[in-house]
Amino acid sequence: MADQLTDDQISEFKEAFSLFDKDGDGCITTKELGTVMRSLGQNPTEAELQDMINEVDADGNGTIDFPEFLNLMARKMKDTDSEEELKEAFRVFDKDQNGFISAAELRHVMTNLGEKLSDEEVDEMIREADVDGDGQINYEEFVKVMMAK
């Protein structure tokens, strides 16, 4: 499954993995998974977190290592983001629910994920997605970016 990923995708997932793997030990625990999900405005129960880990925990050790994480991401990409998942993700970023993701909202979510970005980096991310040039990302632009991944 993971062998169908490009080098770019793998290095992107490595970066995502390290956001989850707070203590850098090469494994994601339920505690670490919960921390990241809560920083994204989700509120999973302990049982839900355990289910998520069990779903991809091939060796049954109760944590997710990088190869298991890659398999999960490859699977997720195959049943590409349903309309509902995209709307949900957009809502996470669109804090004031005005239908747009501003630079401030993007910075806020990235900071919650432990990604300290400079103003330039945030502006660059907005510019890359901002098709109509209004300085923020609307839902259509967001979908384009997510589907291009």
Swiss-Prot record:
Ca(2+) 3 binds at D94, D96, N98, E105. GO terms for cellular component: cytosol; plastid. GO terms for biological process: calcium-mediated signaling. CDD domains: EFh. Ca(2+) 2 binds at D57, D59, N61, T63, E68. GO terms for molecular function: calcium ion binding. Keywords: Calcium, Metal-binding, Repeat. Ca(2+) 4 binds at D130, D132, D134, Q136, E141. Gene3D superfamilies: EF-hand. The keyword Iron does not apply. Residues 8-43, 44-79, 81-116, 117-149 form the EF-hand domain. Ca(2+) 1 binds at D21, D23, D25, C27, E32. SUPFAM superfamilies: EF-hand. Calmodulin mediates the control of a large number of enzymes, ion channels and other proteins by Ca(2+). Among the enzymes to be stimulated by the calmodulin-Ca(2+) complex are a number of protein kinases and phosphatases. Belongs to the calmodulin family. This protein has four functional calcium-binding sites. Interacts with KCBP. This is Calmodulin-6. It comes from Arabidopsis thaliana (Mouse-ear cress). The gene is CAM6.
